[in-house]
């Protein structure tokens, strides 16, 4: 994926506090147009909170988020949803609806009394279903889908929004390895700027850049192999790590062992 240098989403000294506890503190981050940015860190490091702040679901306690150079607080919710789509870990969806119904929900930000459902909305839904390879399952009921199929449908719903930025909060959690690889491959092929929170550091190696959070602070940012070095992994995750080279394709992979 080619990376342009213009930031599309920025945060400056971004902080969030809840019930007296500091969850995120002083985060400075620029997301570049066209890039894939991985957010990694131990449990409770602030990854999910940062994603909620970047899309306006949470309001910052201090600092600022800017979308295309304008304060996020200046945008209406509808305007944000036309630019940013979010795929959460656990998205609630009624079991009775079909796959197509779920994907059609992505058109909501574009509909109004003056702009009712049209052929263009049908076209966007069809494109989204094709992008996530669910056209053949479009009439299936939600309750009959596997975990991987549900997650693909959620990504399809997000793509039907026609976003320029896609935020994903650990989209491969609770999926088997086949579905993990399928979802990550799908995300990498999407023609949007992507910010993705991940637990698996080897998955983060496939992104353009990696941001490491620890105890609510951004402690490292850069190219994956420049950031995910043994010293940082020991300090942040409490594990020893070294790189291996895959003889099949020459790619580098992390191998871990317990510290101590």
Please provide the spans of the model-predicted regions.
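The feature captures the beta-strand-to-loop junction immediately N-terminal to the Walker
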Residues: 40-42
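Helix-to-loop junction immediately C-terminal to a conserved catalytic motif
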Residues: 55
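Conserved ABC transporter NBD signature motif
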Residues: 63-71, 80, 140
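Conserved ABC ATPase signature
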Residues: 116, 141-145, 149
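A short, proline-enriched helix->beta-strand linker immediately N-terminal to the Walker B motif
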Residues: 160-164
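Catalytic Walker B motif of ABC-type/P-loop ATPase nucleotide-binding domains
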Residues: 166-170, 175
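ABC ATPase nucleotide-binding domains
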Residues: 235-260
